[in-house]
Amino acid sequence: MGVRKFVPTRSAAPVPGARVLGLTIDSEFEVAQHIAAGFSATTIGRLARELGVPDKRMLTLTNIPESTYFDRKRRNKPLSAETSSRVYRIAKATEAAEAYFEGDKDAARRWLINPKVSIGGKTPLEFACTPEGSDYVIKLLTRMEHGIIS
C-alpha cells in the first residue's frame, strides 16, 4: 500500500471576525499572529463602514487617539497589538450579530449600537471592546437565538 495524499472534502468553518476585517485566514492561530503583528490602520475604517458608524466613533471604541491613528495610517504603520485585539473583538461580535439576524446587516448594526438593559445600559458595541465583554455579547446573542430572555 502506497502513501496517499489527503484531500479534504469540506472546508474549515470560517474564523469569526475574519470576513468583516477582510482577512483571508484559516485558523485562530493566524488571527493571533495578525493581532501580534498589528492590523493595518485602515482596518478601523473598514470596520466602521461595516457598522455604519463614523471612524471617530470606532477610534473611541478602540481607545486609539485620532493623532496616533492618522499618523499610523499616513506612515503605513500597523496598529498596536492591544488596539488590534480590540478591533478583532468588535469584528467577532459584529459577525455574531449578523449571523443572529440571518445576514441582515442593518438589523445587526441597529442591535449593536443601541443600549441594552442586560448590559447595564451600554451598547453591545461598547461592551464588546474587552475580551469578557465580547464573549458576553456573543453569549447574549446565542441565548437570544435559543429563546432565553436576557
Q: What is the role of each PLM region?
A:
Residues M1-S150:
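Non-transmembrane "mature" sequence context
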